Amino acid sequence: MSDRPAPPRFSVVICVYTEERWGDILAAVDSVRKQSLAPLETLLVVDHNERLLDRLTEEFADARRTGEVRVLANAGPRGLSAGRNTGIAAARGDVVAFLDDDAVAEHDWLHHLAAGYTDPAVVAVGGRTLPAWASGRRPVWFPEEFDWVVGCTYRGLPPGRVRVRNVLGGNASFRRSAFDAAGGFATGIGRDGDRRPLGCEETELCIRLANAVPGAVLLIDDRAVIHHKVPAVRERFAYFRTRVYAEGLSKALVAQSVGAGKGLESERRYTSRVLPAGVLRGVRDTLLGRPGGAGRAGAIVTGVALAAGGYALGTLRARRGGSPAFSWGPITPEGVPQETAAPEQPEKKGAAA
């Protein structure tokens, strides 16, 4: 008889908000239901869209009766964070995994996520997210170092199964007990459909979780692969500019919550090592006559400038009390965190982006 512990039971949460992604939603659910390690349940959380809620309820009527797929309405304010909190509150599994509604998981996705939890110190495991470009190929100017702009794993992250500060939200999992210790995703930060391309809600949560659980370990395992669709509009430089600027605003909110030391720890290495190397590669490719080198180098420089500008403005707003209010707290049965305002952080030295 094997002494190997049984894998954890997974609740997979997919937050949805628009019928325009109907085919993508069905594909995402299908990829979860075909996993080599079957999940306990798939939870579809609908973000304040009654028509989509009714349509999904009808589509998965049979699966709902068996408990394999459940369709829920977001019980909190509009936005991705509250939707995730609704899913967490309803989850019955030992581990809660999150998959984007426009992504497809590979067959062994949950199997590889589960492998990380053999260590009881591990509280979160993320995976590798590959872009599926609408045009069929990466835009020649688009640097791999900025794949986070389209919700994907970017160049500069270490390979293999490695310890990290934070996982990436569209391909992530957490022990259910982690939310009891640290609370849920902060509302007031993160995405609200397509209207607000902010992010960093998972970064803020992961730092808060590490502070709440002594010795907590967070991992990324690059064998846990999903494929994330990148629509044509997000292949354009206009979206790139908007998204990197919004990331700067988001980082300012994270620094306000957890302090600039932890909030910008990984970003300092990224901007001082990864991005300069990317610029040099772009220049080299240009000199060698390879297509797109100058564009990639220029995009990196532009991205740094815009993100820094967003961070500076977000920091100024926070000091003046004009930044968006966000809060977190214990997950209630309704899926809404009890209001806990982000604490004021003393100004720290060395907080430059």
Predicted regions located by residue number:
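N-proximal low-complexity "stem/linker" segments adjacent to membrane-targeting elements
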Residues: M1-S31
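Acidic donor-binding segment of Leloir-type glycosyltransferases
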Residues: V29-A73
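Glycine-rich, basic loop-to-helix element that forms the pyrophosphate-binding segment
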Residues: N74-A91
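Short aromatic/hydrophobic "clamp" motif used to bind/position activated sugar donors
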Residues: V96
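Conserved donor NDP-sugar-binding/catalytic core segment of glycosyltransferases
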Residues: D108-W141
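Short, flexible, basic/aromatic active-site loop/helix in glycosyltransferases
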Residues: G127, P143-V164
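A short, conserved alpha-helix in the catalytic core of glycosyltransferases
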Residues: G169-F174, A178-A182, I189-A224
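Active-site-adjacent helix/loop segment of glycosyltransferases
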Residues: A216-G303, A307
